Amino acid sequence: MAVISETSDEGSNGGAANKKPQEEEENIPPIPKELPEELIVIIVALVRRYHYPKLSLISKAYRDLISSPELFQTRSRLGFTEPVLYTSIGFPPFDLPSWYILHRISLQFKQITSLPSMLPGSAVVTIDYKMYVLGGFIGLNQPVSTMIVIDCRFHTYRELPSMQRDRGGAAAGVIDGKIYVIGGCKKRYNDWVEVFDVENESWETVPGPYPNVASESVEFSQYAVMEQKIYILDPLFCLTYEPRKRRFEAWGRRSQQRRYESCCVVNDMLCTVDSTCSHGYPIVVYDPKGMVWRPVKGVQSSDLPNLVYYESRMANFGGKLVILGGNQSRDRKDSYLEKDIWCIEIALEKREDGDIWGHVESRSVVLSSSKWPLIALSRSVTV
């Protein structure tokens, strides 16, 4: 790039006496009026996500960019994606469940009014920045086949093709980029298992054989994906389903697994809360090889708030175990009035000797209410 310097009329700077500044300026490459699209995507990807709503107000071009898959892919490639925690909380008997998002700075749940209430018995799975909500019950336990997808970047949703069968209390999991849904209807149906192609947005029936040990009318309480298998808690038995081999396996009676009302997978470990501390610790991890539950050492009951753990919900939050649970806090008059929802974040580590150790990194009240909350579920997405 040429540099324009001041010159005297006599050319005393040693340059050509007759060369004018305008001639040197012609050597400067023109500044592009528009930045390359690839550079714009990278620049916006570097901006913190909470600024996106304001950016989207600038112009339609920004709105299109912020909603584009290219921006998410660029953020993922640059390592700028972040986990976001969602939960569905109701206040029975009058208030239907609403979606809430955890704000990382204030550590408070904020209600999302733009999303519909999640039906009781819905199955929910996540893929990147999307949550898929399948089935559920309406009225007097009438199952439905509906399916919606929630875009967690903008808290919008749209309907997807319905399942082939009405389902309530089904299990679901994402394997190889496809959504498998199991049960939630009579087992005698040939479409007891269905698979949803996310790219083509189409359903297909997955043929049997189906497990003989599962209940005839199945409503699963919990499910999670680990080692390319869907782990399912049946009312009577614990099952795994391996879609690649189309194979079901039983891994013990549920009575032997005690009452584990919530579970999630963190770092390929199936975690749950054992409120009875039958293993000496309140958190346990399932060992699929030994088919036994093992304690998470280092986390004592005294490290955790006094919560109603059989109504708690768990999630994998950026590689950490998160537990959401409610308790009642006393006011100054020592009467039970305010109900709190706590968020506990626990780091897990599997050591060389096979022991699992945990450390409570944070515990805080994230929502308070005069009504008793019912936490329907907790999920983490990447945005």
Curated annotation (Swiss-Prot):
The keyword Repeat is annotated on this UniProt entry: yes
Transmembrane regions: none
Region Disordered, residue ranges: 1-30
Domain F-box: 29-75
UniProt entry keywords in alphabetical sequence: Kelch repeat, Repeat
Kelch repeats: 130-177, 178-223, 262-313, 320-371
Key word Repeat present: yes
Family annotation (PANTHER family): F-BOX DOMAIN-CONTAINING PROTEIN, F-BOX/KELCH-REPEAT PROTEIN SKIP4
Name of the protein: Putative F-box/kelch-repeat protein At2g29810
Organism this protein belongs to: Arabidopsis thaliana
